[in-house]
């Protein structure tokens, strides 16, 4: 029975899944959007939304200690100081008044080689 099994496993064991989510999140921070399979897009959306929430909280933090702690948590997930700075200093200020929903998934059709359903996941930026 699969009661209460909410985790998106995406066909990988734990450390491989963690690495995949980390790499996809890094690409979203670096490029703003990526095209990947739909199950991976749904899994990385959950992971990335939590990172964005931490980045927004770090930007809103009134104490320097709280901001540093949140930046360290983001660094633990991304593993690159340059990307942490970009996420907190450049991307997060655009979402200070937003209560979540930082990304959107758009289906783009099947992949040519094997027919896997592909999706575009991108940051939602309001003008």
Swiss-Prot record:
InterPro entries: Ribosomal_bL17 (IPR000456), Ribosomal_bL17_sf (IPR036373). One of its GO terms (cellular component) is cytosolic large ribosomal subunit. Pfam families: Ribosomal_L17. GO terms for molecular function: structural constituent of ribosome. Transmembrane segments: none annotated. Part of the 50S ribosomal subunit. Contacts protein L32. HAMAP family: Ribosomal_bL17. Belongs to the bacterial ribosomal protein bL17 family. This is Large ribosomal subunit protein bL17.
């Amino acid at each position: 029975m699969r009661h209460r099994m909410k985790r998106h496993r995406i066909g990988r064991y734990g450390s491989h899944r963690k690495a995949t989510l980390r790499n996809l999140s890094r690409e979203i921070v670096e490029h703003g959007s990526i095209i990947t399979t739909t199950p991976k897009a749904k899994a990385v959306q959950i992971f990335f939304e939590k990172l964005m929430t931490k980045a927004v909280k770090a930007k809103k933090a009134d104490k320097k200690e709280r901001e540093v702690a949140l930046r360290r948590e983001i660094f633990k997930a991304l593993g690159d100081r340059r990307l942490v700075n970009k996420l907190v200093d450049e991307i997060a200020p655009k979402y200070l008044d937003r209560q979540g929903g930082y990304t959107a998934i758009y289906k783009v059709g099947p992949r040519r080689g094997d027919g896997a359903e592909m999706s575009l996941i991108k940051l939602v930026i309001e003008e």
